Amino acid sequence: MGLASYGNYQKDLQKKLDKFISFDSETGEFEVNPRLRYIGDHSYGSRFTDEFVEIFGKPREDESALESRYADLAFALQYRLENIVCTLAQWLNKQTGSRNFCLAGGVAMNCVLNGRLAGKEFVDNIYIQPAASDN
């Protein structure tokens, strides 16, 4: 998510992204809308459905200019990710009473997210399992 630091908050983009990744803070459940990732036509490659492209725009072609909209989308994704993970951690804290967290996987390598989580009043310790992939 290194590109996120070059982006800006865009309210309309954030609203679109909220529909892409839903989160219920009462149950701790989240879902990536499968219609935007898996279900539907894939005219732009295997990663993007046509519906995703309709909402967020065409993916960047190799060697093409890096437009600000890509950085803004990365910013919006980072923002959404941080909010979901921090809210989920708070939900887990309320469910278990634990103030210690263990993270693993590619998302756990996101140092901006980890810094934000570490600053939460309900967090005492975070262990991040270091052997993860980022694919």
PLM regions with names:
Residues 1-135:
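Short acidic/glycine-rich loops and adjacent helix/strand connectors
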